[in-house]
Amino acid sequence: MMNQYNVTYLSKILCLKTEILYKPFSIINRSIVNQYNIDVKYDDITSIVKIRHKTENTILVFQIFNESNVKYSPIEYDYGDPIIITSNLQHGHNRIPINMLYIDVVESDMFPTFSRLDSETIKIITSILQSDNKKEQSIKLPKVSENELSVKILYHKDYPLKYVRYYKNNMVTGIEVIDRSVAITS
């Protein structure tokens, strides 16, 4: 299941997770990968991805396993959780399905630009969604599944994710923002 190409593509996703670990409210896009040096040591059992920020010199190490063979123990500069390549979509920020790694999604033109919302913006959105009339139901935002790659990338243990803001270029109006609420699926 795991091969050199999958791990190389996954390393770019892990680069984005690294950005969120150090800067939880960063706007994520594919250009962030250029801020990091990525060292990939591929192995059939356990692959190691070492990510170093080019200017800040912070280091983070990810251990990557197939779902059938996880023997995790923390190492120096470790992320804190094993990254598991799974055969199908599963819950958990550290479980990446193999079908997301068939192509280099981060380099794709279809890769979105997105971010987590800060507490002030969440308050504003919540107040806009509330109806003044008690008889009317409040407005609901469209949902994004917790299994989506953007939600897995934005995971941060200290900042629970309630909303994801997507940014889309529009030739007429400039940048559009699209907010989605995170749906917990079971």
From Swiss-Prot:
One of its GO terms (molecular function) is DNA-directed RNA polymerase activity. The keyword Transferase applies. It holds the Pfam family Pox_RNA_Pol_22. It comes from Fowlpox virus (strain NVSL) (FPV). The gene is OPG103. One of its GO terms (cellular component) is virion component. It catalyses: RNA(n) + a ribonucleoside 5'-triphosphate = RNA(n+1) + diphosphate. This is DNA-directed RNA polymerase 22 kDa subunit. The DNA-dependent RNA polymerase used for intermediate and late genes expression consists of eight subunits Rpo30/OPG66, Rpo7/OPG90, Rpo22/OPG103, Rpo147/OPG105, Rpo18/OPG119, Rpo19/OPG131, Rpo132/OPG151 and Rpo35/OPG156. The same holoenzyme, with the addition of the transcription-specificity factor OPG109, is used for early gene expression. It is found in: Virion. Keywords: DNA-directed RNA polymerase, Nucleotidyltransferase, Transcription, Transferase, Virion. Part of the DNA-dependent RNA polymerase which catalyzes the transcription of viral DNA into RNA using the four ribonucleoside triphosphates as substrates. Responsible for the transcription of early, intermediate and late genes. DNA-dependent RNA polymerase associates with the early transcription factor (ETF), itself composed of OPG118 and OPG133, thereby allowing the early genes transcription. Late transcription, and probably also intermediate transcription, require newly synthesized RNA polymerase. Its main location: virion. GO terms for biological process: viral transcription. It is an enzyme of class 2 (transferase).
